[in-house]
């Protein structure tokens, strides 16, 4: 038994060591309420329900231990633990302590196994994506490796950081979440570079209006829309608002936008990076490549960007991937016509280039398709909302500023071939400029191509064009900052009015204005724009095979007044929850930003360069504000995803395994308890039998010894009386001869002595009886008190044995009296 106790002491100390609890026990009885409460809180990470923090008595300790046992039985194990009670634990019952220690040991082992399994699955998926991205980068030409090296390090570092920070609670079934981490992480990174991208917004928009689909996708990757709201809060006021991507099965704006996985704060580089590798690398990370099925054929896969729908047809094994840019529709009519898709297929099928393909290892076809649809739908919805919020305001400012700008000739878009996440290639044909549209040409960010011959010429040409556009870009950037300053001033004035008349009336008025404007826009249609860089809603066109004119894509802009951005966002996201303090904080931050920008804009006596630096600083602070809001939103998403993962793990993945373990554990506990109870009953019966046998033997011995003593005592008394009687007779005969009178006195005196002796003997006997009676009554009273206090059967038998022994003693003493008479 001692060895068993030592083993359980070792188990308890190991549990305390694994849980980092600075307690050590030396005996099994040292496992009191504090030990089990500490184990519960350390293993399960929760406070004990109904806990008495400062126990003042043994009953409080028993209550705390019972609360631990009840929580384990009801909340985690779903089995009955009635054989373990808090009172027995506090009293130091070894069996109860062992059972509870065994439960905690098994629970810790089970949780450790689950954590290791999920961590292993996460590390395997993360390692696969790392190897996939690394292999893709090794296949790129030597001409592009040097320009992309810095961005690769950033992308890999950010991807691994996001994967490692997820923890073991990430659900193993959501394998597609890792790919979304890479894409959304790059999106968050490019958001930090928007201050650099704001230098030439108008030229960039003119480039996007007539460039090829590949260059459009490239620009989309350079300036993606970002979510900045916590539940129903604000989103980014971007200086370039992209058009809506047309996808057949896109979600409506009323449905919730669910983040695939919690994001971490974006990586802010300390040195500027070239936009060319940013766009290229983002395209790698924002597309999931199609898998190769078991029959040797490449399945169809649609990868959606902001304003391009790429259709990959089903090809036999060994052939090339063919990717076709499809016609993009407006936010209300999303499905492109069938004839236009056929024309796009015919256009893009003429420029295919072979590229090695690698089959995917883990993600299935359906998972890849779902990931692509989720990302494209999110980007398209956010793009449309950003465009609606800011497009009209910036359009008015740009129209006023760019009225006298001269027209320049437009160059044809260069042919580019992009690899799609290391599994296929995306090829685009040259894009002809639209006749009748002349605009300024922004130097393209991506001058590289997979064909190595014209790379250097294109780079030289674009560098020269960029140097020529530097003064114009500076003017455009200053105008853009001024436009934002004026917009924030109007926002501030509107907020002051809103404080006087109430937010509800303004919200209703904005809804009516929005409905009227949308109705007029639907009736009149989208106005023609001779200079596409003046508006934020781009018109994506597709060159047909026969050289026909591309049709503009119609998008309904949204009017956003000064202080209606946050109410409009609350209207567009009615399904998101925003707490009162968060909403008030957003209003205060926006108003503070508006006031500061207003103060900076009103200082006309400053120099031009100083004013420009202040406006850029205000824009940077605005980006920091939006980053903070985004972090808050992502934090809430991480918490929600963490809770969802735990709930799914408990309800779906681990349910069968936990049920089996619970059945086995309950059966084991029942068998152990039954064996222990049987052994205890056998020991009890054996002990009672031994007590009865011992009592009988002791009674026999006492009876024999008492009889011997009584016989010896009676014999001694008889001998003594006989000797004394003989002496008296002799003395009487002697004295009778001498003195008759003395003899008579001696006889009378002897009679008196005999009477006195008999009287004293009777008194002594009566005194002994009274003492024995009082002693027996006292012992009987004590035995009765002990019987009422302790109902143990063994102790009851011992009391009966003592009472029977006392009765034997009393009976034997009465028996010894009869021979003396």
Curated annotation (Swiss-Prot):
Primary localization class, coarse: cytoplasm
UniProt modified residues of type Phosphoserine: 449, 451, 453
Ranges of biased composition (kind: Polar residues): 345-355
Highest taxon, organism lineage: Eukaryota
Compositionally biased intervals (Acidic residues): 405-415
Biased amino acid composition, Basic residues: 431-445, 456-470
One Pfam family here: DUF5745
Keyword vocabulary terms for this entry: Coiled coil, Cytoplasm, Cytoskeleton, Phosphoprotein
Coiled coil: 585-632, 700-794
Entry's localization field: Cytoplasm, Cytoskeleton, Microtubule organizing center, Centrosome; Cytoplasm, Cytoskeleton, Spindle pole
Region (Disordered): 118-149, 323-369, 395-475
GO cellular component, one term: centrosome
Biased composition (Basic and acidic residues): 395-404
PANTHER family with a match to the protein in the record: CENTROSOMAL PROTEIN OF 95 KDA
Protein name per its UniProtKB record: Centrosomal protein of 95 kDa
Organism from which the protein derives: Homo sapiens
């Amino acid at each position: 038994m001692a060895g068993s106790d030592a083993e359980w002491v070792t188990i308890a100390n190991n549990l305390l060591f694994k849980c980092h609890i600075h307690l050590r026990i030396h005996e099994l009885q040292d496992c009191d309420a504090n030990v089990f409460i500490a184990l519960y809180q350390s293993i399960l990470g929760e406070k004990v329900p109904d806990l008495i923090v400062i126990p003042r008595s043994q009953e409080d300790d028993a209550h705390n231990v019972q609360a631990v046992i009840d929580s384990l039985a009801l909340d985690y194990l779903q089995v009955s633990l009635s054989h373990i009670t808090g009172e027995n634990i506090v009293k130091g019952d070894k069996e109860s302590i062992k059972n509870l220690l065994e439960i905690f040991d098994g629970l810790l082992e089970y949780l450790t196994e689950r954590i290791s399994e999920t961590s292993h699955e996460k590390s395997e998926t993360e390692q696969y994506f790392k190897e996939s991205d690394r292999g893709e980068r090794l296949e790129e030409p030597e001409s592009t490796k040097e320009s992309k090296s810095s961005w690769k390090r950033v992308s890999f570092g950010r991807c691994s950081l996001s994967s490692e920070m997820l923890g073991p609670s990430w659900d193993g079934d959501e394998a597609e979440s890792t790919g979304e981490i890479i894409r959304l992480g790059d999106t968050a990174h490019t958001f930090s570079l928007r201050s650099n991208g704001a230098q030439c917004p108008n030229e960039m928009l003119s480039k996007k209006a007539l460039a090829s689909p590949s260059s459009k996708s490239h620009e989309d990757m350079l300036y993606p829309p970002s979510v900045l709201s916590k539940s129903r809060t604000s989103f980014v006021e971007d200086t370039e608002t992209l058009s809506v991507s047309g996808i057949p099965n896109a979600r409506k704006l009323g449905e919730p936008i669910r983040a695939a996985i919690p994001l971490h704060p974006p990586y802010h580089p300390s040195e500027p990076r070239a936009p060319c590798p940013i766009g290229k690398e983002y395209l790698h990370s924002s597309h999931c490549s199609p898998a190769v099925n078991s029959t040797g054929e490449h399945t169809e896969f649609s990868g959606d960007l902001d304003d391009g729908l790429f259709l990959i047809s089903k090809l036999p094994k060994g052939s090339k991937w063919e990717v076709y840019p499809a016609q993009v529709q407006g936010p209300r009519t999303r499905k492109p016509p069938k004839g236009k898709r056929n024309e796009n297929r015919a256009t893009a099928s003429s420029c295919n280039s072979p590229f090695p393909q690698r089959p995917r290892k883990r993600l299935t076809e359906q998972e890849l398709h779902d990931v692509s649809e989720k990302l494209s739908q999110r980007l398209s919805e956010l793009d449309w909302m950003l465009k609606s919020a800011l497009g009209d305001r910036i359009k008015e400012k740009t129209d006023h500023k760019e009225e006298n700008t001269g027209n320049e000739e437009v160059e044809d878009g260069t042919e580019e071939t992009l690899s799609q996440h290391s599994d296929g290639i995306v090829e685009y044909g040259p894009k002809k400029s639209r006749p009748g549209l002349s605009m300024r040409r922004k130097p393209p960010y991506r001058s590289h191509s997979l064909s190595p011959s014209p790379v250097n010429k294109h780079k030289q040409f674009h560098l020269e064009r960029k140097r020529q556009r530097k003064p114009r870009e500076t003017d455009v950037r200053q105008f853009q900052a001024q436009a934002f300053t004026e917009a924030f001033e109007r926002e501030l004035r509107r907020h002051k009015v809103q404080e006087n008349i109430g937010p509800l009336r303004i919200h209703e008025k904005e809804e009516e204005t929005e409905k009227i404007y949308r109705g007029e826009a639907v009736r009149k249609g989208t106005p023609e724009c001779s200079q596409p860089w003046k508006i934020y809603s781009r018109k994506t066109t597709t060159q047909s095979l026969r050289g026909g004119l591309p049709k503009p894509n119609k998008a309904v802009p949204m009017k956003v007044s000064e202080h209606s951005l946050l109410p409009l966002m609350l209207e567009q996201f009615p399904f998101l929850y925003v707490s009162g303090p968060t909403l008030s904080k957003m209003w205060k931050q926006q108003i503070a930003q508006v006031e500061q920008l207003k103060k900076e804009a009103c200082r006309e006596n400053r120099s031009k360069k100083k004013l420009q630096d202040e406006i850029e600083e205000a824009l940077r602070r605005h980006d920091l504000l939006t980053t903070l809001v985004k972090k808050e939103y992502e934090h809430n998403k991480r918490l929600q995803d963490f809770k969802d993962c735990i709930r799914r793990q408990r309800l779906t993945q681990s349910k069968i395994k936990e049920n089996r373990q619970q059945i086995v554990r309950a059966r084991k506990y029942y068998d152990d308890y039954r064996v222990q109870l049987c052994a205890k009953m056998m020991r009890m019966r054996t002990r009672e039998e031994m007590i009865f046998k011992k009592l009988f033997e002791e009674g026999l011995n006492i009876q024999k010894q008492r009889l011997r003593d009584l016989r010896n005592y009676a014999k001694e008394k008889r001998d003594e009386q006989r000797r004394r009687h003989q002496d008296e007779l002799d003395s009487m005969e002697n004295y009778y001869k001498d003195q008759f009178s003395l003899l008579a006195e001696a006889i009378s005196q002897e009679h008196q002595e005999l009477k006195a002796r008999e009287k004293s003997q009777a008194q002594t006997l009566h005194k002994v009886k009274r003492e024995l009676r009082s002693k027996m009554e006292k012992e009987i009273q004590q035995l009765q008190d002990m019987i009422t206090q302790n109902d143990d059967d063994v102790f009851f038998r011992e009391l009966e044995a003592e009472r029977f022994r006392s009765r034997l003693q009393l009976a034997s003493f009465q028996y010894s009296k009869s021979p003396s008479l």
